[in-house]
Protein backbone atom coordinates (compact mmCIF):
# COMPACT_ATOMS: atom_id res chain seq x y z
CA UNK A 1 0.00 0.00 0.00
CA UNK A 2 1.04 3.58 -0.59
CA UNK A 3 1.78 5.89 2.31
CA UNK A 4 1.53 9.67 2.57
CA UNK A 5 4.48 11.76 3.84
CA UNK A 6 2.62 11.97 7.17
CA UNK A 7 2.26 8.22 7.74
CA UNK A 8 4.72 8.18 10.66
CA UNK A 9 2.82 11.03 12.34
CA UNK A 10 -0.41 9.01 12.22
CA UNK A 11 1.30 5.97 13.72
CA UNK A 12 2.80 8.13 16.52
CA UNK A 13 -0.69 9.43 17.30
CA UNK A 14 -2.03 5.87 17.56
CA UNK A 15 -4.30 6.10 14.54
CA UNK A 16 -6.36 3.14 13.37
CA UNK A 17 -4.98 2.67 9.84
CA UNK A 18 -7.02 1.26 6.94
CA UNK A 19 -6.72 0.70 3.19
CA UNK A 20 -8.37 3.47 1.18
CA UNK A 21 -7.94 3.30 -2.61
CA UNK A 22 -4.59 1.56 -2.12
CA UNK A 23 -3.39 4.04 0.51
CA UNK A 24 -2.73 3.26 4.18
CA UNK A 25 -4.73 6.05 5.79
CA UNK A 26 -5.98 6.96 9.30
CA UNK A 27 -9.64 6.00 9.83
CA UNK A 28 -9.65 7.66 13.26
CA UNK A 29 -7.26 8.60 16.08
CA UNK A 30 -9.49 8.57 19.17
CA UNK A 31 -13.05 8.21 17.87
CA UNK A 32 -14.99 9.33 14.81
CA UNK A 33 -17.53 11.04 17.09
CA UNK A 34 -14.90 13.15 18.89
CA UNK A 35 -13.21 14.07 15.62
CA UNK A 36 -16.48 15.17 13.98
CA UNK A 37 -17.28 17.29 17.04
CA UNK A 38 -13.84 18.92 16.86
CA UNK A 39 -14.49 19.92 13.24
CA UNK A 40 -17.93 21.29 14.11
CA UNK A 41 -16.92 23.20 17.26
CA UNK A 42 -13.22 23.97 16.93
CA UNK A 43 -10.82 22.58 14.29
CA UNK A 44 -10.15 19.17 12.82
CA UNK A 45 -7.00 18.53 10.79
CA UNK A 46 -6.95 15.95 8.00
CA UNK A 47 -4.11 14.45 6.00
CA UNK A 48 -5.50 14.36 2.46
CA UNK A 49 -2.16 13.86 0.73
CA UNK A 50 -3.57 10.79 -1.01
CA UNK A 51 -5.48 13.13 -3.34
CA UNK A 52 -4.06 13.63 -6.83
CA UNK A 53 -2.52 16.87 -8.12
CA UNK A 54 -1.88 17.64 -11.79
CA UNK A 55 -0.07 20.74 -13.05
CA UNK A 56 -1.17 22.13 -16.42
CA UNK A 57 1.18 24.68 -18.00
CA UNK A 58 1.28 26.41 -21.36
CA UNK A 59 -0.27 29.22 -23.40
CA UNK A 60 -3.48 27.21 -23.85
CA UNK A 61 -3.79 25.98 -20.25
CA UNK A 62 -7.05 27.84 -19.61
CA UNK A 63 -8.78 26.79 -22.84
CA UNK A 64 -7.62 23.20 -22.27
CA UNK A 65 -9.10 23.06 -18.75
CA UNK A 66 -12.28 24.69 -20.07
CA UNK A 67 -12.56 21.89 -22.63
CA UNK A 68 -12.08 19.18 -19.96
CA UNK A 69 -14.48 20.39 -17.28
CA UNK A 70 -18.17 21.26 -17.36
CA UNK A 71 -17.86 24.47 -15.33
CA UNK A 72 -16.64 27.81 -16.70
CA UNK A 73 -12.91 28.07 -16.08
CA UNK A 74 -12.09 30.72 -18.70
CA UNK A 75 -13.79 33.58 -16.84
CA UNK A 76 -12.13 32.72 -13.52
CA UNK A 77 -9.70 35.37 -12.19
CA UNK A 78 -6.18 34.35 -11.16
CA UNK A 79 -6.11 33.22 -7.53
CA UNK A 80 -9.56 31.63 -7.65
CA UNK A 81 -10.53 27.96 -7.63
CA UNK A 82 -13.58 26.24 -9.06
CA UNK A 83 -15.46 23.01 -8.32
CA UNK A 84 -16.50 20.96 -11.34
CA UNK A 85 -16.88 17.54 -12.85
CA UNK A 86 -15.26 16.01 -15.91
CA UNK A 87 -17.58 13.95 -18.10
CA UNK A 88 -17.01 11.34 -20.78
CA UNK A 89 -18.53 11.53 -24.27
CA UNK A 90 -21.71 9.91 -22.91
CA UNK A 91 -22.12 12.54 -20.17
CA UNK A 92 -21.10 10.14 -17.39
CA UNK A 93 -19.00 11.62 -14.59
CA UNK A 94 -15.31 10.66 -14.81
CA UNK A 95 -14.48 12.52 -11.60
CA UNK A 96 -15.29 15.59 -9.54
CA UNK A 97 -12.42 17.93 -8.84
CA UNK A 98 -11.23 21.38 -7.83
CA UNK A 99 -9.18 23.41 -10.31
CA UNK A 100 -7.01 26.36 -9.25
CA UNK A 101 -6.23 29.14 -11.72
CA UNK A 102 -2.67 30.15 -10.86
CA UNK A 103 -2.10 32.38 -13.92
CA UNK A 104 -3.29 32.64 -17.55
CA UNK A 105 -0.86 29.85 -18.46
CA UNK A 106 -0.90 27.69 -15.32
CA UNK A 107 -3.58 25.67 -13.54
CA UNK A 108 -3.61 23.07 -10.79
CA UNK A 109 -6.13 20.21 -10.74
CA UNK A 110 -6.92 18.28 -7.53
CA UNK A 111 -8.63 14.93 -8.14
CA UNK A 112 -9.82 11.96 -6.09
CA UNK A 113 -7.21 9.46 -4.88
CA UNK A 114 -8.95 6.45 -6.42
CA UNK A 115 -8.98 8.13 -9.85
CA UNK A 116 -5.44 9.50 -10.18
CA UNK A 117 -4.27 7.13 -12.90
CA UNK A 118 -7.59 7.08 -14.77
CA UNK A 119 -7.90 10.87 -14.70
CA UNK A 120 -4.30 11.54 -15.70
CA UNK A 121 -4.49 9.19 -18.69
CA UNK A 122 -7.80 10.70 -19.79
CA UNK A 123 -6.49 14.27 -19.46
CA UNK A 124 -3.26 13.42 -21.30
CA UNK A 125 -5.24 11.81 -24.13
CA UNK A 126 -7.06 15.10 -24.74
CA UNK A 127 -3.97 17.31 -24.49
CA UNK A 128 -2.58 16.53 -27.94
CA UNK A 129 -4.53 19.31 -29.66
CA UNK A 130 -3.55 21.96 -27.10
CA UNK A 131 -0.29 23.77 -26.46
CA UNK A 132 0.04 22.52 -22.88
CA UNK A 133 2.22 20.35 -20.70
CA UNK A 134 0.48 18.15 -18.12
CA UNK A 135 2.44 16.79 -15.12
CA UNK A 136 1.32 14.44 -12.37
CA UNK A 137 2.86 15.98 -9.23
CA UNK A 138 0.87 13.83 -6.78
CA UNK A 139 3.87 11.94 -5.37
CA UNK A 140 5.79 15.09 -4.44
CA UNK A 141 2.79 17.05 -3.12
CA UNK A 142 1.18 16.94 0.33
CA UNK A 143 -2.26 18.29 1.20
CA UNK A 144 -3.47 19.11 4.72
CA UNK A 145 -7.04 20.24 5.45
CA UNK A 146 -7.51 22.50 8.48
CA UNK A 147 -11.28 22.71 9.02
CA UNK A 148 -13.64 24.23 11.56
CA UNK A 149 -15.15 27.48 12.86
CA UNK A 150 -11.87 28.37 14.62
CA UNK A 151 -9.69 27.55 11.58
CA UNK A 152 -8.90 31.12 10.54
CA UNK A 153 -8.01 32.55 13.95
CA UNK A 154 -5.94 29.47 14.80
CA UNK A 155 -4.06 29.05 11.52
CA UNK A 156 -3.31 32.78 11.36
CA UNK A 157 -0.62 32.33 14.04
CA UNK A 158 1.51 30.39 11.54
CA UNK A 159 0.73 32.22 8.28
CA UNK A 160 2.55 35.33 7.10
CA UNK A 161 -0.36 36.68 5.01
CA UNK A 162 -3.76 37.79 6.34
CA UNK A 163 -6.18 34.87 6.02
CA UNK A 164 -9.20 37.18 6.19
CA UNK A 165 -8.23 38.40 2.73
CA UNK A 166 -8.57 34.90 1.25
CA UNK A 167 -12.21 34.59 0.17
CA UNK A 168 -14.13 31.33 -0.23
CA UNK A 169 -12.67 29.30 -3.12
CA UNK A 170 -9.71 31.66 -3.37
CA UNK A 171 -6.06 30.90 -2.70
CA UNK A 172 -2.62 32.45 -2.44
CA UNK A 173 0.95 31.30 -2.06
CA UNK A 174 2.18 32.09 1.43
CA UNK A 175 4.59 30.98 4.13
CA UNK A 176 3.18 28.57 6.75
CA UNK A 177 5.47 27.61 9.64
CA UNK A 178 8.41 28.77 7.53
CA UNK A 179 7.38 26.64 4.54
CA UNK A 180 6.18 27.85 1.13
CA UNK A 181 2.55 26.71 0.89
CA UNK A 182 -0.46 27.24 -1.35
CA UNK A 183 -3.25 28.22 1.06
CA UNK A 184 -6.82 27.89 -0.23
CA UNK A 185 -10.14 28.57 1.49
CA UNK A 186 -11.69 25.29 0.44
CA UNK A 187 -12.77 22.08 2.14
CA UNK A 188 -15.02 19.04 2.29
CA UNK A 189 -16.61 19.40 5.74
CA UNK A 190 -19.23 22.14 5.57
CA UNK A 191 -17.17 24.33 7.90
CA UNK A 192 -14.93 27.29 7.20
CA UNK A 193 -11.37 26.20 6.73
CA UNK A 194 -8.28 25.95 4.59
CA UNK A 195 -6.41 23.40 2.55
CA UNK A 196 -2.63 23.63 2.55
CA UNK A 197 -0.72 22.33 -0.47
CA UNK A 198 3.03 21.99 -0.07
CA UNK A 199 6.03 19.89 -1.01
CA UNK A 200 5.76 16.42 0.49
CA UNK A 201 9.16 16.65 2.19
CA UNK A 202 8.00 19.66 4.24
CA UNK A 203 4.69 18.14 5.37
CA UNK A 204 5.85 16.66 8.72
CA UNK A 205 7.26 20.02 9.86
CA UNK A 206 4.02 21.87 9.07
CA UNK A 207 1.89 19.08 10.58
CA UNK A 208 3.82 19.31 13.87
CA UNK A 209 3.40 23.09 14.00
CA UNK A 210 -0.34 22.73 13.36
CA UNK A 211 -0.66 20.01 16.02
CA UNK A 212 0.82 22.41 18.58
CA UNK A 213 -1.91 24.93 17.70
CA UNK A 214 -4.68 22.31 17.94
CA UNK A 215 -3.71 21.39 21.49
CA UNK A 216 -4.42 24.98 22.60
CA UNK A 217 -8.00 25.07 21.26
CA UNK A 218 -9.31 21.55 21.89
CA UNK A 219 -8.89 20.76 18.21
CA UNK A 220 -7.64 17.39 17.03
CA UNK A 221 -6.38 15.42 14.06
CA UNK A 222 -9.24 13.71 12.23
CA UNK A 223 -9.32 10.61 10.07
CA UNK A 224 -11.22 9.48 7.00
CA UNK A 225 -14.14 8.33 9.16
CA UNK A 226 -14.82 11.87 10.39
CA UNK A 227 -14.19 13.24 6.90
CA UNK A 228 -16.90 11.00 5.46
CA UNK A 229 -19.39 11.92 8.20
CA UNK A 230 -18.71 15.65 7.81
CA UNK A 231 -19.05 15.61 4.03
CA UNK A 232 -22.31 13.64 4.23
CA UNK A 233 -23.79 15.99 6.86
CA UNK A 234 -22.90 18.89 4.54
CA UNK A 235 -24.33 16.85 1.64
CA UNK A 236 -21.13 16.89 -0.41
CA UNK A 237 -20.95 13.99 -2.84
CA UNK A 238 -18.38 11.19 -2.84
CA UNK A 239 -17.16 9.87 -6.16
CA UNK A 240 -17.65 6.13 -6.56
CA UNK A 241 -20.66 6.18 -4.24
CA UNK A 242 -22.98 9.08 -5.05
CA UNK A 243 -21.78 9.47 -8.63
CA UNK A 244 -19.72 7.64 -11.23
CA UNK A 245 -19.56 7.12 -14.98
CA UNK A 246 -23.11 5.73 -14.92
CA UNK A 247 -24.58 8.97 -13.57
CA UNK A 248 -24.69 12.42 -15.13
CA UNK A 249 -24.50 15.75 -13.27
CA UNK A 250 -28.23 16.48 -13.66
CA UNK A 251 -29.17 13.29 -11.80
CA UNK A 252 -27.03 14.03 -8.74
CA UNK A 253 -27.87 17.70 -8.19
CA UNK A 254 -24.79 19.11 -9.94
CA UNK A 255 -26.53 21.00 -12.75
CA UNK A 256 -25.01 24.17 -11.27
CA UNK A 257 -21.52 23.10 -12.38
CA UNK A 258 -22.61 22.48 -16.00
CA UNK A 259 -22.27 25.50 -18.29
CA UNK A 260 -23.84 24.62 -21.64
CA UNK A 261 -22.86 27.95 -23.23
CA UNK A 262 -19.32 26.66 -23.91
CA UNK A 263 -17.76 23.59 -25.49
CA UNK A 264 -16.50 20.67 -23.39
CA UNK A 265 -16.18 16.90 -23.55
CA UNK A 266 -19.64 15.33 -23.15
CA UNK A 267 -21.61 18.50 -23.93
CA UNK A 268 -23.75 16.94 -26.67
CA UNK A 269 -24.70 14.02 -24.45
CA UNK A 270 -25.55 16.36 -21.55
CA UNK A 271 -27.75 18.56 -23.77
CA UNK A 272 -29.84 15.45 -24.44
CA UNK A 273 -29.65 14.18 -20.85
CA UNK A 274 -30.96 17.49 -19.52
CA UNK A 275 -34.23 16.97 -21.40
CA UNK A 276 -34.96 13.56 -19.86
CA UNK A 277 -33.76 13.37 -16.27
CA UNK A 278 -35.43 10.30 -14.74
CA UNK A 279 -33.52 10.05 -11.43
CA UNK A 280 -32.44 12.39 -8.66
CA UNK A 281 -30.31 12.30 -5.52
CA UNK A 282 -32.31 12.90 -2.35
CA UNK A 283 -31.49 13.30 1.35
CA UNK A 284 -33.01 10.83 3.81
CA UNK A 285 -33.38 10.81 7.59
CA UNK A 286 -33.86 7.25 8.84
CA UNK A 287 -35.68 6.21 11.98
CA UNK A 288 -33.39 4.56 14.52
CA UNK A 289 -29.61 4.49 14.49
CA UNK A 290 -28.85 1.80 11.92
CA UNK A 291 -26.66 2.91 9.01
CA UNK A 292 -27.92 2.48 5.44
CA UNK A 293 -25.19 1.20 3.12
CA UNK A 294 -24.62 1.74 -0.58
CA UNK A 295 -26.88 -0.45 -2.69
CA UNK A 296 -29.69 -0.93 -0.13
CA UNK A 297 -33.04 -0.78 -1.92
CA UNK A 298 -35.37 2.18 -1.38
CA UNK A 299 -39.14 1.59 -1.58
CA UNK A 300 -42.14 3.89 -1.89
CA UNK A 301 -45.52 2.31 -1.16
CA UNK A 302 -43.85 -1.08 -1.48
CA UNK A 303 -42.44 -0.36 -4.93
CA UNK A 304 -38.71 -0.01 -5.64
CA UNK A 305 -37.84 3.63 -6.48
CA UNK A 306 -34.05 3.54 -6.18
CA UNK A 307 -31.14 2.74 -3.89
CA UNK A 308 -28.89 4.19 -1.20
CA UNK A 309 -25.62 5.72 -2.41
CA UNK A 310 -24.15 6.87 0.96
CA UNK A 311 -25.20 6.49 4.57
CA UNK A 312 -23.83 7.18 8.03
CA UNK A 313 -24.81 8.12 11.56
CA UNK A 314 -24.63 11.88 12.08
CA UNK A 315 -23.24 12.81 15.53
CA UNK A 316 -24.07 16.45 14.82
CA UNK A 317 -27.76 15.75 14.21
CA UNK A 318 -28.08 12.61 16.32
CA UNK A 319 -29.70 10.81 13.39
CA UNK A 320 -29.00 8.17 10.77
CA UNK A 321 -28.76 9.97 7.42
CA UNK A 322 -28.32 8.86 3.83
CA UNK A 323 -28.30 9.91 0.20
CA UNK A 324 -30.29 7.89 -2.31
CA UNK A 325 -30.58 7.92 -6.10
CA UNK A 326 -34.30 7.56 -6.73
CA UNK A 327 -37.06 8.13 -9.27
CA UNK A 328 -37.74 11.79 -10.08
CA UNK A 329 -41.29 11.33 -8.73
CA UNK A 330 -39.96 11.22 -5.14
CA UNK A 331 -40.28 14.56 -3.33
CA UNK A 332 -39.42 16.23 -0.03
CA UNK A 333 -41.75 15.02 2.72
CA UNK A 334 -42.26 11.55 1.22
CA UNK A 335 -42.09 8.57 3.57
CA UNK A 336 -39.91 5.85 2.08
CA UNK A 337 -38.62 2.49 3.25
CA UNK A 338 -35.01 1.30 3.18
CA UNK A 339 -34.50 -2.46 2.90
CA UNK A 340 -31.78 -3.67 5.29
CA UNK A 341 -30.14 -7.13 5.17
CA UNK A 342 -32.60 -9.83 6.18
CA UNK A 343 -35.45 -7.86 4.62
CA UNK A 344 -36.01 -5.48 7.56
CA UNK A 345 -37.69 -2.29 6.38
CA UNK A 346 -36.59 0.96 8.06
CA UNK A 347 -38.65 4.13 7.61
CA UNK A 348 -36.96 7.10 5.96
CA UNK A 349 -38.16 10.67 5.45
CA UNK A 350 -37.09 12.68 2.40
CA UNK A 351 -35.69 15.98 3.72
CA UNK A 352 -34.31 19.18 2.26
CA UNK A 353 -30.58 19.32 1.43
CA UNK A 354 -28.17 19.95 3.07
CA UNK A 355 -28.63 18.01 6.30
CA UNK A 356 -26.35 20.50 8.06
CA UNK A 357 -25.12 23.99 7.25
CA UNK A 358 -21.94 24.93 9.08
CA UNK A 359 -19.54 27.87 9.18
CA UNK A 360 -18.45 27.48 5.55
CA UNK A 361 -18.36 30.79 3.70
CA UNK A 362 -20.64 30.44 0.69
CA UNK A 363 -19.85 33.64 -1.15
CA UNK A 364 -17.57 32.62 -4.01
UniProtKB/Swiss-Prot annotation:
Pfam families listed in its UniProt record:
GCV_T, GCV_T_C
Alphabetic keyword roster: Aminotransferase, Transferase
Q: Name one GO cellular component term.
A: cytosol
What reactions does this protein catalyze?
N(6)-[(R)-S(8)-aminomethyldihydrolipoyl]-L-lysyl-[protein] + (6S)-5,6,7,8-tetrahydrofolate = N(6)-[(R)-dihydrolipoyl]-L-lysyl-[protein] + (6R)-5,10-methylene-5,6,7,8-tetrahydrofolate + NH4(+)
Q: What molecular functions are annotated in GO for this chain?
A: aminomethyltransferase activity; transaminase activity
Subunit organization: The glycine cleavage system is composed of four proteins: P, T, L and H.
Q: What is this protein called?
A: Aminomethyltransferase
- The source organism is Thermotoga maritima (strain ATCC 43589 / DSM 3109 / JCM 10099 / NBRC 100826 / MSB8)
